[in-house]
Amino acid sequence: LSPEYLYLFFLRPEFDRYARYNSWGSAREVFSWGNMCNTMIPLPTITEQQKVVNAWKAFREIKEQNEAKAAPLMQVCQSYIQELKHKYPLQEIGPYIEECDERNVDLSVRLSQGIANTKVFQAPKQVALNSKSDKIVRTGQFGYNRATTRNGEKISIAYRTGADCTVSSAYGVFKITNEDIIEPYFLWMWVSRPEFDRYARYMSKGSAHEFFEFDEMCRVKIPLPPIEIQRAIVNIYKCANEAKQIAEEADQLSREVCPALLQHVIHS
């Protein structure tokens, strides 16, 4: 019996249910050593056990390697952004952005999206019955939820890299007018910082509901290094994010594929 094979057997949701069902007690139920010893498991050959273990190890290795790459790269990005505040004067972004108010009147855009406070587009919580009034966010534009009340002390803003989509008519949409001065991804990295969340909340106005309006967005100040430096920082971030995504996919696959392999071994 391979210890790692046994560990993978224990990781299965089926074993969680088995252990819960076979726990005994009144105020506190326990899965005793005796219950553990009475657990029945299928025992394929050690070679078959090792095949499953090797697949699990491969996914875990991919996950750990890419996590090790992503962490320092993310730290480099953050440190660069911090340094920029001291090296370059802060400038308002107003002269370089333009508000967009294109409505989906002909229903040509069918993809409806919301925006999470994690700064990404997501499936909407609800879709308007009359989507003709929804605003269109074109590829390369920014969308944001003007309302900052009851939003986890954050502002929901995202940069659209996928296909054109629509958002609620209550949202704001804008684009950068000169990408030779501001790299869109660089601006997105800046507004994704916790410091910007605090700034947006502080500058929001209203009574029962507070809003961060477009005129306040125009007054946001950021350091503007040469475009080559902005793009270099963005490229580092993209490398870090790619490594992070690979790690997450490997982790997800290890949770999906390995139980399936184990199930195959059990029933073969």
Regions found by a protein language model. Name each.
Residues 1-4, 24-47, 165-170, 205-231:
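A short glycine-rich beta-alpha junction/loop motif
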Residues 94-130, 144, 162:
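DNA target-recognition patches
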Residues 15-18, 196-199:
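Periplasmic-binding protein-like
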Residues 11-14, 101, 148, 192, ...:
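Hydrophobic alpha-helix feature that most strongly marks membrane-spanning transmembrane helices
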Residues 1-11, 139, 143-192:
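A short beta-sheet element
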Residues 38-104, 223-268:
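Non-catalytic DNA-recognition/assembly elements of restriction-modification systems
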Residues 21-23, 106-113, 202-204:
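Short coil/turn segments at secondary-structure boundaries
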